[in-house]
Amino acid sequence: MNVELRIHGVAGASPGSVLYPGSDKPGKLLEDGVSGGVGFYRPDPQPTPGWIRQAYVWGGLTSGSKTRALWLLLLPFALVNIAFFMTPHRIVDGRERRKPLRKTVDSLQRLFALSLTATALFGFTGVYLNILAWQSAHTPFGGPLSWLSTLNANDISLRLSLSSLIPALALSLMWLLSTRTWKHTDQIPAPQGPPPSPGPLLNRRRMWNGGPPVGRLRSLHVAFGFTLIATTLTLADPHPWLLTAEAIIGATIVLTVALPQAATRKDPEAERERLLTTFCTTLRWAGLLVYGAALLVPLSGPGEQATPGPLPGFDPMVESVFWTQIALMVVVAIGVAILARGQEDASGDNRYGRALLGLAAPATMLIAWTYTAALAIGAAFIVAEMVGTPAFSRVDVPEAIVLPESFAWALYAVPIAVVMLIALALWLWLTYRRTARKINDLISSHYPRPEHERVSKAWAAAALTDRAQAVFATIALTAIGTLVLVGVIRTTQLTIKPWPPLVLAGAIILIVFVIALMVVGYAAYRLPSLRRTVGVLWDISTFWPRATHPFAPPCYSERVVPELITRVNHLIADGNTVVLSGHSQGSVIAAAVVLQLDPAARPSTRLLTHGSPLRRLYARYFPTYFDTTTLREVQNATPWNNLYRNSDPIGGPVATDIDQAVWDPVSPPPDSPIRGHIDYYVDDDYRTALNSLTTP
């Protein structure tokens, strides 16, 4: 018997829309191993004689729960995690070259991810400790802890201790959420298979066996976060023994994160590194203990009087992390450039070259850092404006709230970025118009003249996806330009000060950005349709395991891929031929499953992809995992057909000998719908391609 196992794509999908596409009267649905809306479904009765149709529905893992809307705050962590998988490996004749350099780049990326945790916490400590607890004590507003002023004149220690509970609570919440998702995704064991071969990285089951390494990284990030909050408290009222303990714990955490063993994934049957896991857990409790000491020790002393200006030690801490992050990004960029050099597509097919010349990883890291800094700086400006008057240097104004001067220079990038994005939008519009004119000439023999404009516009809009790297480059270049400007000014000690109008414009735009993000998050929490739209971010980003940042949204593939492998093996054991039918992101999942199957199971497996981004996006941005060698390995593993439309903004061709272009819209009749990325199932070409895979 032939089994068609459908795997849907981005933006979620209901079981009915996958099993009964385009039907006004769908039949009954039977669940099979469904948990939380995720699992296998089949229609009753089966709609096609001689075929068993099933669907694997996984959209609930990224857009099902209302709490997924809060993942917008975790986007920087997801981006820095994606950057890890964008990093190229130099593979020559099936063997990796320059492995020490690649491992060094991996370690630096983990350290950068750790620094992002620091930046996120600076957003909380900057607001609650620096502004509300310390500086607002001098303002007429007094802050939300103004009632403490009725106790005594030296209440600053109590103000700081109480305020530190909010950052600690935020960190504890990230700890709790990452632990819960870790148990439901990373801890699901990958099925044991044959010994790993020196082939594509995707055929190694260790990739989906992330329980131990993600657990270790989580412990280290939690430890670092609590140590950072403790240090912020201690610098306001220094105790040498406490500062020494914090420095030792912090340095130990940094060194441990840099160790390759901290994040090493092993095959399912391999022995776990229990000693290192125990050490990381010990560091986590040490970080929590030192925070408890920093919280309570100042309360036992005579108390300190808050001095005008920022919280002692806070600005230097922010600045040191700021420049450390820049150094990490520069070194990673150099390392990635060396790894990417000379790694062009060996097949000679240059339709889709490597994105950003192979430098997508550092560009994505830069965007993640920009996003995190924007949230932290925007929140600081909003609160500073509420309780006083924001300033960047000490001024003789009672209500002045002094923010780090680096914030002012960072704000320079905001209006400049807006101007550059407007210019980019204009360029994309001109490109769209020019492409539409070219397409109009190409389709003249296939469509009647009244259809030309509609079809050419749809195809031209879809082609803009191939310009996506221009957006990455614009944001990255803006940030780089600003950093160079600030670096020159700071290192040469020029007396140039930030230009107030540009700083004001940046502050306003940044405040609007933060408020807009909150509005979108709230709306996504309330509206399932918007939540599915926002969920597209997670459909793409959380396909990848949490290799560098444990607080990133969970990797659904660590549940999806093992479940699909188990189902395919079960169906094949019953004597069936299984056609994995992957649409959009489902095609990426299906390709990963094919490579994970035991060689003995592959002859009974077929692959049908439609609207697939495998070559158009994944091979460009993740060449280590989806280059032509890997895609050729999938072809060698099982018969494969790929359908694509020129009107599809996501899917595209994969390989010449398996591709089949589908006209969209179909003609005649006129005015038939342009389907773009959806409803491949209802095309006649789909049924033809499906049957051809099982016809001798």
Regions found by a protein language model. Name each.
Residues 1-508, 512-542, 546-553, 568:
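N-terminal membrane-targeting/anchoring modules of bacterial envelope and secretion proteins
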Residues 527-562, 604-606, 612-696:
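Lipolytic serine-hydrolase domain surface
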Residues 563-576:
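Conserved acidic catalytic loop of the alpha/beta-hydrolase fold
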Residues 592-596:
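Active-site signature of alpha/beta-hydrolase-fold catalytic machinery across serine-
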